[in-house]
């Protein structure tokens, strides 16, 4: 008998696309309903497939949940890191670009899944700890820019922690505010959110 041939590139791409579809659907459901309220049956219904077909990719809800956390968290933060790598200018210019990109991703790509990271207490302990780690990595991007602006005298804040709490709370609501708007109005709304949040780093400054 001949050796078993490895799967073709086309097969790998198809599998990868299917896994991404499953992870996106699962992340949306976890964000909408909470971890405990979602079953593999719900994910299958969202995708219009059988529950059995999901077991070909994931053996349990815990495995699927972990993969959804890892994929969403890594992809989201990686996109923000890549943005900062190619963005130059003052701390304010870079912070505005970072806020704008974060809100754009939340509104256009992951409107429901964003809540997945806002309520980690609902998750089993292992996934809860991983969510915290991913949030810290994400938070560090904003914190570094705010601290840089404070150190240079460009920003005036009540405290860095308070600014971050207010900023993340507002950004988490952006999908609700902007998501139902038509495309042209949505872009303007995202611009306004970014500009408004910059006021948090100019406390007491005029002009």
What are these regions (language model features)?
Residues 1-6, 101-108, 139-151, 168-170, ...:
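C-terminal peripheral helix-coil segments that are non-catalytic and often amphipathic
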Residues 18, 61, 72, 76, ...:
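Hydrophobic/aromatic residues within well-ordered alpha-helical segments
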Residues 18-21, 29-63, 67:
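Helix-turn-helix
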Residues 55-58, 117-123:
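Short helix-capping/turn signature of helix-turn-helix
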Residues 67, 81-111, 163-167, 190:
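Hydrophobic alpha-helical connector segments
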Residues 74-81, 105-108, 115, 125-151, ...:
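Amphipathic alpha-helical packing segments from all-alpha helical-bundle domains
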Residues 113-118, 158, 179-180:
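Short, hydrophobic secondary-structure boundary micro-motifs
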């Amino acid at each position: 008998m001949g050796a078993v041939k490895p799967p073709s590139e086309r097969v790998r791409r198809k599998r990868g696309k299917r896994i991404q579809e499953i992870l996106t659907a699962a992340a949306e459901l976890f964000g909408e309903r909470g971890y405990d309220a979602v079953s593999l049956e719900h994910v299958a219904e969202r995708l219009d497939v059988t529950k059995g077909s999901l077991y070909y990719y994931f053996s349990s809800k815990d495995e699927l949940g972990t993969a959804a956390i890892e994929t969403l968290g890594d992809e989201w933060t990686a996109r923000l890191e890549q943005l900062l790598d190619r963005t130059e200018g003052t701390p304010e210019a870079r912070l505005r670009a970072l806020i704008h990109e974060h809100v754009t991703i939340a509104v256009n790509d992951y409107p429901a899944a964003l809540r997945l990271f806002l309520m980690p207490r609902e998750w089993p302990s292992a996934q809860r700890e991983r969510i915290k780690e991913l949030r810290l990595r994400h938070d560090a991007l904003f914190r570094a820019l705010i601290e840089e602006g404070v150190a240079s005298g460009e920003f005036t804040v009540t405290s860095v922690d308070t600014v971050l709490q207010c900023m993340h709370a507002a950004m988490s609501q952006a999908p609700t505010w902007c998501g139902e708007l038509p495309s042209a109005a949505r872009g303007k709304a995202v611009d306004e959110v970014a500009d408004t949040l910059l006021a948090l780093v100019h406390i007491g400054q005029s002009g």
